[in-house]
Amino acid sequence: MKSIRVLMVLDTMDVSGTETHVLSLVKELQSRGIYTAVVTGNGSMISRLRKTGCKIHQMNFPKTLTINSEAESLLLNSLVDLLRKEQISLVHGHQITSGNIAAKAAKLSNIPFIFTLHGTYFPKSDIKSVLRITDAAVAVSEPVKKHIQPFFPKNISIIANGIDTTDFSPSPSLELREKMNIPPKAKVILYCSRITRHKARICMLLIKACRDLKKDIPNLHVIIVGNGSQLKDIKNMAASIHSSCKEEFIHFTGEQQNVKDYYALADYVVGTGRVALEAMACERPVISCGNLGYFGEVNSNNFQQAWECYFGDHAAKQASSQAIIYRDLRNLHQSSIGVPTGRELRKLVLEHFDSKKIILPLIELYESTIQSFEQQQAIN
């Protein structure tokens, strides 16, 4: 088999789990001598992508699948030309709109297309549109696999988001504490997410829970990392809480590319999906809740269950609520098991989610997909 040349395709390079995942894939593929290029729109993570040394091609993808034929034709021609110039042997899409265009370009270029679905929150009709022209599908969790199985008759590979455990590892936080005017002995709860829709609601529930938790933990501080359309509403709520508590203890950092520094600062992290995994890699205790509901404290005994629902982001048995978040954070604080639990969680992430291990089944899928595609072409 000839050497593999991969083109990764994303809508944009904004700061979020999917883009961070692709960044880690690019690093790992290149470290193994696999040529990897990326085509994407704008985004604040472009600078980090450039540092990997990969070839970056910027393209303005539509925001929805609905696009006029002239605009689609221009995009397709540009992509087909790019695939030819880069001598790409496999295209890997990660988001619906760019993935749909890329899959069509791959078909026109007689190149196999792989699509990774990163969540269950996309319209089923959009998922179907991409999967019907996909040669191999990847789900990042078991619930995502179940979600797309009715639309894809072939085998679906489960390949989790890999974590760069060298980058995400325990580190000191005194300098950042001083910068944010957080006392050395203060207890810090961190929430990291885009502040939109379900994730914004979780943020509101957390802030309300922390208002009550402040009575139990007088030296409590809360850090909210992320931007989004509902950030203003969250800030207004925080201002009201500060007024009633007569103390400003909720901090907003906006979007951060080096979120690992904030994990290091936190005693506890509330999050889901990739945030939960990154925090655990940094030895931080995690309360997981996501798009589909609440899981709770993650520990070595329930780690497998937490992974199976992707830490509340792709499945859940109960809804998130202010009362349950308050209860679990208070119990976690009173148990004083943060440090040993954090160490156990990092070991589990190293064992199951290290990007250096996760990349291996993906490379195998690349090789088998190209081989199957070429065999089918020979028959036809």
State what each model feature region is.
Residues 93-99, 117:
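Short His-centered aromatic/hydrophobic patch
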Residues 78, 169-182:
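A short helix/loop element that forms part of the nucleotide-sugar donor recognition site in Leloir-type
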Residues 3, 8-16, 20-22, 27-70, ...:
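N-terminal strand-loop element at the rim of the active site
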Residues 225, 234-256:
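Nucleotide-activated donor-binding/catalytic signature segment of Leloir-type glycosyltransferases, i.e.
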Residues 7, 182-203, 207-210, 223:
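Conserved donor-binding/catalytic core segment of Leloir-type glycosyltransferases
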